[in-house]
């Protein structure tokens, strides 16, 4: 019996372990909507949209900018700016420790990335929120990078686009974070005075101080399908009003139906459709229609 264990069973277990370890981590991804198990390389081809149920999964800010902007001529805006714990804030953890953990997890200094570049050859300034960095919360650096991007748009006489994904103002920066609502709104007012378009793209989720400021100030407000958009979350509202909310409440389709946003565009159509829209707003020749990615 012992020889059989040594000669047959143990090598079999070892071979099984080798097979398990040979499968790279992260090769498969489970759709949070339909539970389909998806092959990661195939999912990347669909821009992280489930091919089974069309669920638009959350993607990082750099991935967002990479699929939106032309490949050449990109320049990051405000990359040297880093958050500072001016208030020495502490809740269950020190704010500086939360920042360090978020920076290590995401590889980013803060929750917004801004770039100048081109879209189908048209100069453009673009911002994208990184939701993985403290819930995409807006603090001093997020506000400053957004304003710098707006200033680039003013200097270059080009449009500004922002992809929002945020839980709202950053609690750990208190009034400093709330001030960013006014600061970013003032920057957008300057763009409007100069006749330069701002397109706000709402992705899942957009809440709090971001939804109450820059995200809803677009000349055109676009959303991805089924994105959650609001000020307070549905559970908070239900507890306050003590009523059951309507089906699909705070989803982008609900907001479109009630006139709060202008259009819903699937992720694989955002680049060509926004390029054509911005060309019209900037009185430029419309770019050649791009093939829609499957």
Curated annotation (Swiss-Prot):
Binds 1 zinc ion per subunit. GO terms for biological process: fatty acid biosynthetic process; malonyl-CoA biosynthetic process. This is Acetyl-coenzyme A carboxylase carboxyl transferase subunit beta. It comes from Ectopseudomonas mendocina (strain ymp) (Pseudomonas mendocina). A zinc finger (C4-type) spans 31-53. InterPro entries: AcCoA_carboxyl_beta, Acetyl_CoA_COase_Trfase_b_su, ClpP/crotonase-like_dom_sf, COA_CT_N, Znf-ACC. Residues 27-294 form the CoA carboxyltransferase N-terminal domain. Component of the acetyl coenzyme A carboxylase (ACC) complex. Biotin carboxylase (BC) catalyzes the carboxylation of biotin on its carrier protein (BCCP) and then the CO(2) group is transferred by the transcarboxylase to acetyl-CoA to form malonyl-CoA. It holds the Pfam family Carboxyl_trans.
């Amino acid at each position: 019996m012992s020889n059989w264990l040594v000669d047959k069973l143990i090598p079999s277990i070892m071979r099984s372990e080798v097979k398990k370890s040979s499968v790279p981590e992260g090769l498969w991804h489970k759709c949070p909507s339909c539970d389909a198990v998806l092959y990661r390389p195939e999912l990347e081809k669909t821009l992280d949209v489930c091919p089974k149920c069309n669920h638009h999964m959350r993607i990082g800010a750099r991935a967002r900018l990479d699929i939106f902007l032309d490949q050449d001529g990109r320049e990051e805006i405000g990359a040297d700016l880093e958050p500072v714990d001016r208030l020495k804030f502490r809740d269950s953890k020190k704010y500086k420790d939360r920042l360090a953990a978020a920076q290590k997890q995401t590889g980013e200094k803060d929750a917004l990335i801004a770039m100048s570049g081109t879209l189908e050859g048209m100069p453009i300034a673009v911002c994208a929120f990184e939701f993985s960095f403290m819930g995409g919360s807006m603090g001093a650096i997020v506000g400053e990078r957004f304003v710098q991007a707006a200033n680039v748009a003013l200097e270059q006489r080009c449009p500004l686009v922002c992809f929002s994904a945020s839980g709202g103002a950053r609690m750990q920066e208190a009034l400093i974070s709330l001030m960013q609502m006014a600061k970013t709104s003032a920057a957008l007012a300057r763009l409007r005075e100069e006749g330069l378009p701002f397109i706000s793209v709402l992705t899942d989720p957009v809440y709090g101080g971001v939804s109450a400021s820059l995200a809803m100030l677009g000349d055109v407000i676009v959303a991805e399908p089924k994105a959650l958009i609001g000020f307070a979350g549905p559970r908070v509202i239900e507890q306050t009003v003590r009523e059951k909310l309507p089906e699909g409440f705070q989803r982008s389709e609900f907001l479109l139906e009630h006139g709060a946003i202008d259009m819903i565009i699937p992720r694989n159509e955002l680049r060509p459709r926004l390029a054509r829209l911005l060309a019209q707003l900037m009185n430029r020749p419309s770019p050649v229609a791009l093939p829609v990615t499957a």
